[in-house]
């Protein structure tokens, strides 16, 4: 949760200066959207401008993991992501400084290109196993990423099983993970995709088009998984334009069984939203469990 005590602006400015090699003094600071989890600010010094996320000091590992994910996606040279500048903790806060991006309005070509770029990210390789070099977060929820050989095992145990255990502690009328996990493994069966570097939290608010027309993806929960998890989430919470899917499938054609797997993959996010926010997500998650697992 964001904190109300004064932020360590001087410390942040000093670290920006040290990291970039350019003197930076905050001439202007304004509050901008940081999402449901963090506080967001724009810091300006002449032509230099940065986006800063703030949270409680104990959340510094969340920002460290986000920076690692952004750096890994950038290294593939497939899709634009915000460049992390620096991160740290001071005076009761943790912070992540990113390059400032100017968002515009996308057209058919830019959304088509975003789909192509995401497919290229998914095909970039980089790991023989599923998981990630460190645990990270999905929103504010811890996301475990132990290296795992089997995709069915990874998703069943470390995605749905983990979120279900949290949900049962919040509301006892969810099924036991000990019952659900074997069913998920059976449903995914022998699906063993090549591990893809995925964004991990790609709803419509985390994809945008810059004023230059270049597509960009934001706020990742990165790991190596099934590329379909990203595609599935783009259809949740508003969806992406049709041109995006045309572009994606021009590089990576749709595979049989995706419509069934999509429900399973998006159940992870609905469970996470219940664990974060409660409310109607409980009923939605229970309906999805019945729909895809007959539970």
UniProtKB/Swiss-Prot annotation:
Supply the EC number(s): 2.7.1.-
- UniProt key word Phosphoprotein: no
Top-rank taxon = Bacteria
What Gene3D superfamilies does this protein map onto? 3.90.1200.10, Phosphorylase Kinase, domain 1
Q: Identify the keywords attached in UniProt to this record, alphabetized.
A: ATP-binding, Kinase, Nucleotide-binding, Transferase
Does Hydrolase show up as a keyword for this record? no
Q: Which residues bind ATP?
A: 99-101
Alphabetized PANTHER family for the sequence:
FRUCTOSAMINE 3 KINASE-RELATED PROTEIN, PROTEIN-RIBULOSAMINE 3-KINASE
Per the similarity annotation, which family is this? Belongs to the fructosamine kinase family.
Q: What is this protein called?
A: Probable ketoamine kinase slr1563
Q: What is the lineage of its organism?
A: Bacteria, Bacillati, Cyanobacteriota, Cyanophyceae, Synechococcales
């Amino acid at each position: 949760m964001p904190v109300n005590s004064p932020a360590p602006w001087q410390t942040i400015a000093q670290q920006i200066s040290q990291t970039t090699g350019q003197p930076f003094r905050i001439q202007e600071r304004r509050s901008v959207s940081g999402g449901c989890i963090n506080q967001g600010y724009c810091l300006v010094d002449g032509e230099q401008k940065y986006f800063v996320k703030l949270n409680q000091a104990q959340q510094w590992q969340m920002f460290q993991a986000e920076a690692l994910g952004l750096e890994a996606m950038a290294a593939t040279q497939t899709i634009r992501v915000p460049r992390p500048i620096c991160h740290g903790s001071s005076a009761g806060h943790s912070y992540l400084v990113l390059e400032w991006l100017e968002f515009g309005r996308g057209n058919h070509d830019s959304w088509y290109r975003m789909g192509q770029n995401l497919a290229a990210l998914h095909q970039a390789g980089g790991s023989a196993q599923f998981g990630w070099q460190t645990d990270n977060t999905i929103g504010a929820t811890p996301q475990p990423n132990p290296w795992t050989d089997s995709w069915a095992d990874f998703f069943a145990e470390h995605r749905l099983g983990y979120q279900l255990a949290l949900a049962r502690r919040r509301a006892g009328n969810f099924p036991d993970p000990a019952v659900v996990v074997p069913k998920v493994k059976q449903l995914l069966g022998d699906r063993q995709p090549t591990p893809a570097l995925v964004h991990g939290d790609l709803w419509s608010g985390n994809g945008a088009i810059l004023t230059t027309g270049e597509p960009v993806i934001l706020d990742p929960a990165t790991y190596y998984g099934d590329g379909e998890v990203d595609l599935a989430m783009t259809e949740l919470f508003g969806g992406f334009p049709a041109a995006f899917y045309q572009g994606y499938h021009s590089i990576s054609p749709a595979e049989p069984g995706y419509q069934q797997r999509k429900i399973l993959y998006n159940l992870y996010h609905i469970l996470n939203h219940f664990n974060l926010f409660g409310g109607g997500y409980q009923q939605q998650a229970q309906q999805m469990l019945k729909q895809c697992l007959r539970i």
